[in-house]
Each structure stands twice: as C-alpha cells, then as structure tokens.
UniProtKB/Swiss-Prot annotation:
SMART domains in the record: Pumilio (SM00025)
Stretch list, region Adenine-nucleotide binding in RNA target: 1126-1130, 1198-1202, 1270-1274
Protein name from the UniProt record: Maternal protein pumilio
Polar residues: bias regions: 470-479
Sequence ranges of Low complexity compositional bias: 207-237, 256-276, 863-875, 1496-1519
Location of the region described as Disordered in the Swiss-Prot/TrEMBL record: 102-149, 207-276, 304-331, 382-452, 470-558, 697-725, 846-912, 975-1008, 1494-1533
Comp. bias intervals (Gly residues): 133-149, 243-255
Domain notes: The pumilio repeats mediate the association with RNA by packing together to form a right-handed superhelix that approximates a half donut. RNA-binding occurs on the concave side of the surface. Pum is composed of 8 pumilio repeats of 36 residues; each repeat binds a single nucleotide in its RNA target. Residues at positions 12 and 16 of the pumilio repeat bind each RNA base via hydrogen bonding or van der Waals contacts with the Watson-Crick edge, while the amino acid at position 13 makes a stacking interaction.
Pumilio repeats: 1111-1146, 1147-1182, 1183-1218, 1219-1254, 1255-1290, 1291-1326, 1327-1362, 1366-1402
Transmembrane segments: none
Keywords, alphabetical: Cytoplasm, Developmental protein, Phosphoprotein, Repeat, Repressor, RNA-binding, Translation regulation
One MF term in the entry's GO annotations: mRNA 3'-UTR binding
Species: Drosophila melanogaster
Keyword Cytoplasm: yes
Length: 1533
C-alpha cells in the first residue's frame, strides 16, 4: 500500500484522521476488545505511515462502533483472528523503518513519476484479516478505516469514518462529516468483506489456486441465488451519507440505499461455498470496483447503475457513453466517460434512471468480479482463451487478462516480485471477463494501483513475457496475442511505426506533438485522453464491428475507487449557489460559493433526479460561483479522464453561458444582467446549474435494449425538465427555457448522429462527443472550438432508424469527421481517433446552411452544396438560445451577448458582428432613439468597436452583396460562395501585418477619449469602448489584438448614434457622448498611417493604372520616399516634359538633402542629375555643397555625390572635391567614402587632386594593404599624372616583397605590372626572379608571378622559365602538383616561345603519367593537349611520290587503339606523317622548329601499352601542294 502523491497531502493540509471503522458488536453493541483489536490492526497497517510524519492537526485514530441493523455483522469472534491481526501488525511494524514519505515537500526526490499516481488507500493486501462471514455472533477485527484529510470530526450520529465518537481528535477540517455514521456501516461492511477474503487466503492458498483455475474455466457463471440476493440487497434500505467535494462536508441526508459493500459481503458468502479460494474478486470489488460514497446512486437499480456521485478525484460522476446498438442480450454494462477536473454536485444521484435493465445476467455477474484497473500507460496483455466461455466475435472465446505472478502473495507485498519494481502490491483484474476483447479496452489514468509504467523495468519484463513464445507458432499461447499487441500502446509517448513513418498531417490529430498538446486541468489533451480514440485500430478511420460489437463493464474506463470522497479538491464547490436556491436546509456548503442541494428525498425527488448529473462548468465564475481552486500538484489529474466538455449538452451549456458572463463582466455597457459581480456570479451559477440539470437528464444515451422504452424515458425526462423549471429562481427561468430547448436538440442529435457508416456496422456511440475543448484560457470557456455538427451533411445513404418513429437520414446530420477553418481560412479536419479540434478564428459564418437558423421551411434559394434543412431536433447541436441561434447567424436578434466561439456575428467576441460588414451598425445605433442615454451610447460604442475591430465595407452595395452575411448566398462549404467580403474601396489590407502593434495606438486613443470632457451620461459609452477595445483577446498584451480597422466606418456608426440621440430630445448629453465615441472610433479605425496619403495608398494598390506625373502634385516627396512611388517617378522623368520636370524639381528641391540620404529618394535625385536640365543639375549641385563629407560617408548620399561628379560642370566638381580636403584618409578608408574618392580621381582634373596625392605621402604601403585604400591607389596609378604617381610608385617599390604576398597589396602590384611603365615592371619582375618556386606556391604571390610571366619581355620571360626548367626536375614537378603554382606553369605554357616550350615539354613529359593522379596536375595535361590540338590535324593523309598515298596513313588509321592522332607537318622538302597510338591517350609530340623544319620527338620511354609508327614519305614537289581538300596554313582541315 502506498500513499504516493495521493491525497494525504492536499490543498490545506490539516490533521490526519485515521478511522478504523470496525463493525463490532451485535445490533449496536460495541465490544471493547474488538475496538482494541481493530485499532491495533489499523495502527499497524496504516498508521505507521502517518505516524512518521503527522500533519499539524494531529492524528485521530478512532474506532467507531456502528450498529443499527447491519446484517451479517457481528461481534468479534475467536481469538484466532485476533492473533492474526497481531501477526499482521508485527509484520507491518517491521516495514515501518523502510517506509519513507513520498510527499513533494519533504526533500526526498521522487525519481519515478509513477509514484505520484494515486493508489487506493484500502489495499486489501494490507488489510487486517477479518473473521468469517458474520452471523451476529462471530465477527472479526474490522478492516482499515478511511483516512481523512484533516482530523476526524467526532460527534454526531454514531461513529464517523475518520474519527468517530470514540476517537475523533482535532477540528481542522476532516473530510468526513459527523452525519456519516451510516456511511461508516457501509464502509465497514465492505472492509469486513476484504478482511474476510484475506483471511480465507491465509487459511487456504491451495484452495485459492483451485478456485482461480475454476474461474478461468467458468468465467461467466452466475448463480441465481447471487442474483436474487443482489436484488434483495438493493431493496434493503440503509442510511448512507452523500459524500461531497469541497471540504468534504455532507450536503444532505443520505438516500436510503444499501451500499454495494454489503452486497459484496452477501455475494461473498455464496462464493465461498463454490469458489472458496476466490478472494481476488472480493478484494478488487472492494478496493477498486465500487466506492462507498456512491451508494445513493443505487436506488432504482443495481449497483451497475450510473453513479452520479464523486467516483474519482475531481470527477463529477460521468457521462456514460452511448451503448452500441444491438439486441438486449448482447449488451453489457456501459463504459463511463467521466468528466473530470470538476466539482461534484452529488445530490440525488440515485434518481438517475437505471441503466442495467438491459444487461444480461452473465454480464452482471462477471462485472461484479471486474476491476479493470487500466490506465493509458498500462494496457492489459490478454492471454489466449482456452475456448471455454460465452460466444464472442473472437474465435476461441474471450481473452483473459494476463495473470501477473506475485499478486496476492503476502510475501510479495514488500518485496519486488516478478512484475513490479514498486514497493506495493499491484492490483490486476480477475481472470474472468464479461466481454470478448476485440482490441484494447478503453482506458484512462484512473490513478489506481494497476500501473505498468514504461519508465521502470515492468515493461521490459512484459516484453520478455511476450517474446518468450512465438506468436507465429499456432501451438503457442501467444498466437492470439499478436493482433492485440499491435493495437496497444503502453504509453502516450509511444508512437507506432506508422506514426513515425508518415508525416504529420493536419487531418490526423495523432500528428500532434507532445509539446504542442495543451494539457487540460485534468491532465488530458483537449479534454480527451489520447487512448480514448474512437476505434481500436490505429490508422483506420472506422471502428471494426468485431472490435466494437461487445459492450464493456461499467468500471472499465474509470473503476470507482474506495475512499473517493478523500479525492475531492479542497475549495471546489458542489453546486454553485444552489444551496440557497433549491436546497431544503439540510444541504451543507461544500466550498466557497458551493452549496449542497441535498434536501429531503420526498420533497425534492425530481429535483434530485435531475440534479444528480449536474456538472458545474469548470469555468471562471460561472458554474461554481467562484474561481476553480488550483488543482493539487500531488493529484494525478490524468486520471480524471475526459472532462464534461465531451458532452454536447454540457459543451453548449458552459460555453454559451460563460460567454455571456464574460461579456457581462468585461463589457459593462453591453451587460443585460446585474451589475454586481457577486450577484451575477451567483445568478450564473444558479442558471447554469439548473440548466445543466435539465440538460443532463437527456444526455445519457440509451443502452442496448428496448429503444421504445428509451423513447418513453426521454419523454418522462422532458416532463421532469418542465417540472424542474418551476423550482428555478426567477433570474434563471428565461435562460433555462432556452437551455432546455437546446438540450432537447442536443440529446436528439447525440442519438441521431452516431457514427454509423454501414447498416451492418456497429456504431461508435461517442462520436458525438468528439468536439472537445481546449485548456481554458484563465478559466474562461475555450474559444474557437467548433463542434463537427456545425456542418450538417446531406446525401448520405439511408440508415436504419434508431427509433420506429424516427425520420430517415434526410434530417440527420451525417457527421463523420469534423471540419474546421483555421485562422488563415484553410480547411482543416480532425481525425476520428481523438477528435481533437482545431483552434480557429472564424473568418465568416459560412459553416451553417442559411436555413439552419430559422424555424419552418427556408426561403427559396439556388442550388447549394448543403441544402437548408428544417428546424428539427436533429438539426444541430446548437438550437435557439436567447432569441438567436448560437451556432448559426443571429441576424434578427437584439442580443448583445452570446458565444465567443460561435458564428453569430452579432454576439461573438471573436467573429465579426453583423454590424461589421453591413450598414446595420448604423441602424442598430439608430434604434437607440427611444432608449436611454446610456443605452444609446452603448449601442454607438458597440458599433464603433465592431467597426474598429473588423475590416469591412460600409457602402450599401457591399452590404447588399453580402446581405445579412450569408442569408442568401453564404455557402457552408469553401467550394461555395466567397467566405470573405470583397475588398472595398477604402481598404486593401484585410489584416494587420503586425498583430498587436496597433494596441499602442488604441491605448493612446483611449487616453485621448478620457481627456475629453464627457458628461456623466457618456460614462457607459466610454466604458463600453474601453471594454471592447481591451477585451481578453484584444488587450495590449495580447498577440490576438484587433486587426487594422477600416477608416471612417466606426465614426459613421457612432455619428448615426449621435444623430439618433439628438432626435430623442436628449441632444446635449447624448450627442456629446456619441460624438466622443465617434471621435474615438474614428481615431482608432479611420486615421491613415502617418506619412502615407490616400493617393499613395491608392497608387500602391494599383487603383490608378494611368497615373501621370502631373497627378502627383504636392505628393512628389512622399512618392519619392516610397519604393513604388520612387520607381514610378524615375521612369516618368526619363521621358517627362520640361514642365513636368520643373514641377517635380520644384517639390524635391526643398527636401533635396533628405531625399539624397533616403533609401528610395536618392534615386530620384540621381535621375535629375542624369536627365535634368543643366540649370537643374547646377541647382542640385549647389544643394550638395556644404554636405559633401556627410553625404560621402552616407550609404545613399555617396551615390548622389558620385552621380553629381559625373554630371556637373568642372567648376562645381572642384568645389565639391575641395570639401574633402583634410578628410581624404577618412574617406579612403570608409566603405562609402572610398567610392567618392575614386570617382573624384576618375572625373576631376588631376591638378585639382593634388591634395589627395599629398595626403598619400607616407601612407602608400598602409593604404595599399587596406581593402578600400588599395582601390584608390590603383585609380591614382591609372588617372594621375606621372609627377603624381612617381612618389606613389617609389613607396611601392620599397615594399614590393611585402605587397606581393599581401591579400590586398598584390592587386596594386598586379596593377603596376599591367598598366605601369616598363621600368616599373622590370623592377617588380626582377624582385620576383630567383623566388619563382616559392612565390608560385603562395596564394596571393602566385598571381603576381603569373602577371610577371605575362607582361615580361622576351628575355625576362625566358629567364623566368629557365629558372623553373634548369633548376631541377623536382621544382617543376612540385609546381605542377601545387594548387597555386600549377597556374604559373600553365601560364608559362601559354606564353612561352618554342625554345622554352621544348624545354618545358622535355621536363613535363616524364611526369605526365604521375600528373594524372593529382587534381592540379591534370590541368597541366589538359593544357598541353588543348594547346597541341590547335596545331595538329587528326585526319591528315600524306602523299608519296607519284601521288601514291603513304602506306603509313592507312596503317595509322587502321591501327585502332584507344586513341589515334595523325599529325601532318609539312615543310618545304618532305611530308612527315606520324601516327601514335596510345591506350592512355597520350598525344603525339611534334616540335616545329623556327626554321620551318619538322622534328618528330619520339617518346623517351614509352609504356608497354604504347606503340608508335612513324613513316616519312619520299620527296614531294612542294610546288604542287598536297592533293586533297583545300588546305589552311599547310594543314589539311
């Protein structure tokens, strides 16, 4: 047993009350020795945990004797049981020192997150052994009592659980009220059964094994006696206490229903006769299956009825999922979809209509033994069935849960057994199962002890178990396990292989990343746990009939826990303000703002029935009448499962009403309810609670069985709703009526829209719940969560009717996958596995057919993708509320409050209202003629806020085009009519380029508005504007700030309000208020951006395609500073007339300097220097004077200076240049100024630039090595006179060796070699000689060496080449392989004369084969081949004497080798034909001497693969010339 992160430390930790509610005595008698024995057992079993670290409130260990007609409970029996208790006490005492606290604040690190998951405090393995079944004479020491959060509250009627009359201590807020005496009896009965089962196990372990085997063989036996006894137990009434949430105080007298623990005790007596060793079922039923606080929910049915009470930490009961359709006998208990994270309104849950009349007896019996303690992190492994059992869709019978060894063994409690790494006994389900598993069961983190976490070695052991056998072997026990393991995920973090292989798609919600998932307050994503997908086959869009055919036990999803009353969060209310609304005085408040609605059973029977499922919304200040208390960090909130947002009815209730509350609290000018925040919250709580109660009655779907009877129940429930309205407060009657009507539609839609694809396929009953909610935004209803039923689909195939009187599918929305539009307008969809919706901001209300919001037949319309449907119960999830359709377009409503996330533009805070795109805002303001001043101002403010918040058109044509926003032409599909209004003439930007940037402007406008002397009557208007401008998603700190508004539209609407107010004989006050609102609205939305005129805006938006320069009068400067405007002026100036140029010039002259430094304006100035008249050029030149240095150092001004130097007169050039005197070096080293200096040297007379030469004295080397200065030096060497360049060159020669190797200086040396005098070149070449090899290998110097070889004289070049060739072969070989020097060798080959070329070829030839191995050596070979191909002819045919072709020619052509090169060199005396075949593609080497004779160079050492044949023909008469094709240069082409 462990209390790791459970509820031993919660909000407001008080004393620890340890109650040992032993049922002792006979008919009320209390045995002292029994009390002592029970207290000792409890202290040993539980107390040691808390005794090590008691809470400040002290520890109360009470023994409460409870009598009063508890059947089957007697006094303490034999001393054998007492001895056993003592033995267990000693056993647990030994482990006391090994136990440490697992609280989060004691300094101990919790490395295993699973340790924080709550485990049932009543672990049967730790329970003291009880006696055999009591018959009034022999009992046993009671099991461990409940552990309260605070100290027990003593006194009252009988012993209390967590204290009691005999042992209560402390008064600081235990969880158990003094009126829980009856609950103690029930609890004790259950504990007695657990202790008795443990005792049986101690006595007969062998019998237990035999019984377990028998249970495997007979998993579905149900004894008639047990059934009869269960029914009798249900009919026996015993007072039970109704456990609350909040502070744990009871909120009403218990409803006299016998606790299931007593039923279990009676069942156990029968089971002992037939299955004496079967203790697992008792233990699990006691510990996990049924919680004692839910006993009041048993009236009118068996213990498998829907429990409306608190069945889980932070839960309010649950919303049972709809049963799969099928015959009555095929169904079993249904799965509960618990709405976690909420407070509980547990009053009268017993009036819930029974849900078990359609269950077969075997399912009931098996479910009684069921304790499906499964979590999303621990899927069950199912052994192959032995073929015995009831028939199911799985061949061979159902698969039994894997029996984990070590469970139930007393020795395995405190030591690590085979499957556990945690120091507690892990509960597992019993071998029997009431259904056949076609896949993994629906699970949730219920927080009980059955935890298999992937973070410990358990999973590894499970894997070993799985792979110990071969699933492919037919004889193996694992052969049936493989298809089930494929569908299991041991943790939410585990991704299937398909998820890894496929990319995330917006249509697949499983593509969500972990860090993208918003965790709700209950720890699940969007209110839906990932493992509660809507099919059991990942990747499939439809659930398989074989997997969904069998129902599941009621405790499968969230097995109710013992002591769940301990799990309620402190401070959570139980019913809003209902204690004073419908309570009868017996209700006890359970938290701040929460009142119990218990009351007398007879007086409020119907009330209790309807309020049993009340689920107060989890929103701020609405459902509970207070902010929801912070969830305890020690509570595993993932165990809460899906919250109540899954229910369509509750989704409707909480969001709609919460939005109204939001508007009332934030928009006081628009409020229609009480101004007192507390009163509004109380009214909201009452109305919401009442409406929720009325709606929740119709929420539970009908289980398998008679659908006609379900129809009758629905009618009865509707009658109860009508009766319920009579009990409601006056403030909530109107809302309740609309809420009831909406819930009727929601209930019908929930039944009608089950996920039925084919008639032969079972339905997934909870597809209607896929519209979950995001995590609340500071406790406010989620926004942008549109349920999938907003798109009623048509044209589906007829389905089987759900009821005999139900209509066909033509009136039923065919919902399969919800579609969404994101904030960009893209259509997105949510997958059917989890149904996670997309967050979006509605661009337009087009997802609902036009006729969906009207009662009766719709008006005649053209063909549409989604035809309008009649207003039926199956029409939509959201029906008429507050006179408007929440999900539709409330075009004729005057309500100013509504859902933020609806498509109702007149009520939505996040969708454009009706007044946004149409002129109805003016009409709405005009309707305020007969209203008060505040109302008129509020209407004007609303219109202004709407206009200022959303872009739109104000013209009547645009309004008529869109009418009432889709009443006639808005399509429900993106394929239909446009979903956004056409761009108006006043706006082109439909959205803000910087969302949130306009908040500052809005704030300034509000400050200006506050500064205006408004009369007192305009306070409401001012407050409304402020509230509308600073709503939640439009605040100054929000990124979802309002987009840019349309100019003038808000002011028009407010002005209309002013006119209307003036007509109402309240001219002074109202007109002033409306005028102020109009001014504020106009300032917010109508003011253009500073520096951009309307003309420029229209031009930028291409509204003036034929704009001319003359049309830009008084806008030239503005256009020049704009990118598009500047380009327009530049293009026009090239062909402009003189008058147009003068008009432009006159405007830019005043702002010439600012335009010179402008990023776009400088181009206009340059154009004038280029295409302007001489006078204009000179005038602009005069504007440059006095600013030359500043402009020269400026990025854009330097361009203007350069253009001016090219265009102005020489006199002005000199004037401009002389302004740089004294700043030459500064400009030369500047990234912008160096360009100006270079332009000066290029354009200005060199005589006028002597100051630049003078400034360079002594700075040549430093400037030559400067990235910018080296450029200026080169310009000087190009354009200056010899007298000016001589001192520069002299300094260069002094630093030649350094400059050659400098990254910038080498450019200066190269420039001298290219453009300098010959004497200067010779000086540089001589400095290179003797260093060719070294400098050629330098990155920068190699460039200089190349220039030396290129620009040297013949003698100097010969000297450089000879230096390389005559040195040694190694030098040339190194240069050819070097990455830099190889370029020098190539340059030598290019420019060398034949004598040098001969030397080079002689040196290179031996290394040609080796050069092919080097990247840079290949360049040499390529250069040689390319060079010699120019002087060779591959197809020359030589002729001998008498015109006979030379035989060698044919031989050369036919000597096919890898490559053949035929070279013909003609001289005056003979023709030489050389044919060389080389498999390595070696070229033929032919040297042509200067005297014209040809010399064939034979390979010095030809390779073995080379063959050469050279034939010299006889003498030929040179005067005849060659015979054949025309020759060119004595070479045959």
């Amino acid at each position: 047993m462990k209390f790791l992160g459970g509820n031993d430390d919660r909000n407001g930790r008080g004393g620890v009350g340890v109650g040992t509610d032993a049922i002792v005595g006979s008919r009320g008698g209390v045995s002292q020795d029994a009390a002592d024995a029970a207290g000792a057992a409890a202290a040993a079993a539980v107390g040691y945990v808390f005794q090590q670290r008691p809470s400040p409130g002290g520890v109360g260990v009470g023994v409460g004797g409870v009598g009063g007609g508890v059947p089957g409970v007697g006094a303490v029996g034999s001393t054998l049981h007492e001895a056993a208790a003592a033995e267990y006490a000693a056993h647990f005492a030994q482990k006391q020192q090994q136990t440490r606290w697992a609280c989060g604040d004691d300094g101990h690190g919790i490395d295993n997150p699973d340790k924080w998951k709550y485990n049932p405090p009543m672990n049967p393995a730790n329970a003291a052994p009880g006696g055999p079944p009591g018959n009034g004479s022999n009992g046993g020491p009671g099991a461990i009592g409940t552990i309260g959060m605070g100290s027990g509250l003593g006194g009252g009627g009988g012993g209390g659980a967590g204290g009691g009359n005999n042992g209560g201590s402390g008064t600081n807020g235990g969880l158990h009220h003094q009126s829980m005496a009856a609950a103690a009896a029930n609890m004790a009965a259950m504990q007695q059964a657990a202790a008795l089962a443990k005792h049986n196990h101690m006595i007969s372990q062998a019998a237990a094994a035999v019984a377990a085997q028998q249970q495997h063989q007979h998993p579905h036996q149900q004894h008639p006696q047990q059934q009869q006894q269960q029914q009798q137990a249900q009919n026996q009434g015993h007072p039970h206490h109704l456990m609350g949430g909040g502070n744990g105080l009871g909120n009403g007298n218990g409803l006299g229903i016998q606790h299931p623990g007593q039923q279990q005790q009676q069942q156990q007596q029968q089971q002992q006769q037939q299955h004496p060793g079967q203790y697992n079922a008792n233990l699990l039923n006691h510990a996990a299956a049924l919680g004692h606080m839910s006993s009041y929910a048993q009236s009118g049915g068996s213990m498998y009825d829907h429990h409306g009470g608190a069945m889980h930490p932070g839960m309010n009961g649950g919303m049972p999922k709809q049963q799969p359709l099928g015959p009555p006998g095929a169904g079993g208990p249904q799965d509960y979809v618990y709405m976690g994270g909420q407070t509980t309104v547990p009053m009268g849950a017993a009036m819930m209509p029974p849900q078990n009349q359609y269950m077969n007896s075997s399912a009931v019996a098996a479910a009684n033994r069921n304790a499906a303690i499964t979590t999303s992190t621990a899927k069950k492994l199912w052994e192959k069935s032995d073929g015995k059992g009831v028939s199911s869709s799985t061949p061979g019978g159902p698969l039994h849960p894997l029996q984990i060894p070590g469970i139930g063994d007393p020795s395995s409690v405190w030591k690590d057994h085979t499957w556990s790494t945690q120091g507690e006994n892990i509960l597992v389900p019993p071998p029997s199962r009431a259904y056949a598993h076609g896949g993994a069961s629906d699970t949730s983190n219920s927080g009980n002890a059955g935890i298999l976490s992937p973070r410990d070695s358990t999973c590894a052991k499970v894997v070993e178990y799985v792979f110990s056998g071969s699933p492919t072997n037919k004889d193996s026990s694992l052969s049936g396990l493989e298809p089930h393991l494929r569908n299991l995920k041991f943790d939410d973090n585990d991704k299937s292989r398909d998820d890894k292989e496929k990319a995330n798609s917006p249509f697949d919600t499983n593509g969500l990343k972990k860090d993208d998932q918003v965790t709700n307050s209950n720890g699940v994503v969007n209110g839906i746990d990932d493992d509660k997908g809507f099919n059991r086959t990942p990747g499939s869009r439809q659930p398989s009939p074989a997997e969904e055919s069998q129902p599941r036990p009621p405790n499968l999803l969230f097995p109710p826990l013992p002591f769940n009353h301990m799990l309620m969060d402190h401070g959570q209310g139980m019913g809003g303000g209902l204690g004073g609304v419908v309570g009868s005085g017996n209700g006890v408040g359970g938290g701040s703002g929460g009142g119990g609605a218990g009351g007398a059973y007879a007086a409020h029977q119907q009330m209790a029935a309807q309020m049993s499922q009340l689920q107060p919304p989890m929103m701020n200040g609405v459902g509970g009448g207070m902010p929801m208390a912070a969830q305890s960090p020690m509570l595993n909130h993932q165990a809460a499962g899906p919250n109540h947002m899954e229910s369509p009815g509750n989704l409707l209730q909480q969001q709609n009403f919460d939005v109204q509350q939001l508007f009332r609290s934030q928009n006081p000018g628009l409020a229609a309810v009480a101004t007192n925040a507390a009163a509004a919250a109380a009214a909201a709580a009452a109305a919401t609670s009442a409406a929720s109660a009325a709606a929740a009655v119709g929420a539970p779907p009908v289980p398998n069985g008679s659908l006609q009877q379900s129809q009758q129940q629905q009618q009865q429930q509707q009658q109860q709703q009508q009766q319920q309205q009579m009990h409601m407060a006056a403030a909530s009657q109107q809302f309740l009526a609309a809420q009831q009507q909406a819930q009727n539609a929601a209930y019908a839609a929930q039944q009608a829209t089950s996920y039925v694809i084919n008639p032969g396929q079972e339905a997934a009953p909870y597809m209607g719940m896929i519209a979950a909610a995001q995590m609340p935004y500071y406790g406010v209803a989620p926004w942008g969560m549109y349920p999938g039923n907003l798109i009623p689909q048509q044209g589906t195939q007829p389905r089987r009717p759900l009821t005999p009187s139900q209509q066909g599918a033509e009136n039923q929305p065919y919902q399969v996958i919800p579609a969404f539009l994101d904030h960009t307008g893209s259509l997105l969809m949510g997958g059917p596995r989890t149904g996670t919706p997309m967050r979006l901001v509605s661009p337009a209300p087009v997802l609902v057919p036009p006729g969906a919001t009207r009662a009766g037949p719709p008006p005649p319309q053209g063909p549409q993708l989604y035809q309008p449907q009649p207003q039926t119960a199956q029409q939509n999830l959201y029906s008429q509320q507050n006179g408007s359709s929440v999900g539709g377009l409330a075009l004729n409503t005057s309500s100013l409050t509504g859902r933020r996330d609806s498509f109702d533009r007149s009520t939505s805070a996040f969708s454009p209202s009706t007044m946004d795109y149409t002129s109805s805002g003016v009409a709405a303001a005009a309707n305020a003629v007969n209203s008060t001043v505040a109302q008129a101002a509020a209407a004007a403010a609303a219109a202004a806020a709407a206009r200022g918040k959303w872009p739109g058109a104000m013209s009547g044509a645009a309004s008529g085009a869109y009418g009432a926003l889709g009443a006639g032409n808005a399509s429900a599909s993106p394929l239909g009519a446009p979903i956004t209004p056409p761009p108006s003439a006043q706006s082109c930007l439909l959205g803000s380029r910087a969302p949130g940037a306009e908040s500052r402007q809005r704030q300034q406008q509000q400050q200006q508005l506050a500064a205006v002397g408004l009369p007192a009557t305009a306070a409401a208007a001012q407050a409304a504007v402020a509230a509308a401008a600073n709503n939640m998603f439009g605040s100054n700190s929000s990124i979802f700030s309002n987009p840019l508004a349309i100019p003038g539209t808000a002011a028009v609407a407010a002005a209309a309000a002013a006119a209307a107010a003036a007509n109402s004989r309240q001219v002074a006050a109202t007109a002033a208020a409306a005028a102020a609102v109009a001014a504020a609205a106009g300032g917010v939305g109508g003011a253009p951006q500073p520096g951009r005129s309307r003309l420029l805006e229209d031009f930028r938006n291409q509204r003036y395609p034929n704009l001319q320069l003359r049309d830009l009068a008084n806008h030239i400067v503005e256009f020049s500073q704009d990118q598009h405007g500047s380009r327009f002026i530049q293009q026009k100036l090239e062909r402009a007339t003189a008058a147009e140029k003068q008009m432009v010039f006159s405007e830019i002259l005043a702002a010439a300097y600012s335009l010179m430094t402008d990023v776009f304006g400088n181009y206009v100035i340059q154009k004038f220097f280029e295409f302007g008249t001489p006078e204009q050029k000179n005038t602009l030149g005069m504007q440059v004077k006095g600013h030359v240095l500043q402009l020269a150092l400026q990025m854009y001004g330097c361009r203007v200076i350069q253009k001016a130097l090219e265009s102005i007169s020489p006199e002005q050039q000199q004037e401009i240049v002389h302004e740089l005197d004294g700043h030459v070096l500064k400009c030369v080293k500047d990234q912008n100024g160096n360009h100006v200096v270079q332009k000066c040297i290029e354009c200005v007379d060199p005589v006028a630039l002597q100051f630049i030469i003078n400034a360079f004295k002594g700075q040549v080397y430093s400037l030559s090595t400067h990235p910018y200065g080296c450029r200026v030096i080169q310009r000087i060497l190009e354009h200056c006179t010899a007298e000016q360049t001589t001192p520069i060159l002299d300094e260069l020669h002094e630093h030649t060796e350094q400059l050659i190797q400098d990254q910038y200086g080498n450019y200066v040396i190269q420039h001298v070699l290219e453009h300098g005098k010959q004497e200067d070149k010779s000086i540089l070449i001589n400095s290179v000689r003797g260093k060719v090899l070294v400098l050629s290998q330098h990155k920068f110097a190699s460039n200089v060496v190349e220039k030396c070889v290129t620009h040297a004289t013949r003698g100097e070049r010969t000297g450089l080449i000879d230096e390389v060739c005559t040195f040694n072969d190694n030098a040339l070989h190194v240069m050819m392989k070097d990455q830099y020097a190889n370029y020098v060798v190539q340059k030598m080959i290019d420019v060398s004369e034949p004598t040098q070329l001969k030397k080079l070829m002689t040196k290179i030839r031996p290394h040609m084969a080796a050069l092919r191995k080097y990247t840079y050596g290949k360049h040499i070979n390529a250069k040689l081949e390319k060079y010699y191909m120019k002087i060779t002819n591959p197809i020359t045919v030589g002729t001998g004497a008498g015109g006979v072709p030379a035989a060698s020619s044919a031989a050369a052509v036919s000597s096919g080798a890898t490559s053949a090169s035929v070279t013909a060199c003609t001289s005056g005396s003979s023709t030489t034909t050389t044919s060389t075949t080389n498999s390595l593609a070696s070229p033929t080497i032919c040297s042509v001497q200067e005297n014209g004779s040809a010399m064939v160079v034979e390979p010095s050492s030809p390779d073995a693969s080379e063959s050469s044949s050279s034939v010299v023909s006889g003498a030929v008469n040179s005067s005849l010339g060659p015979i054949g094709p025309p020759t060119n240069g004595n070479v045959v082409l």
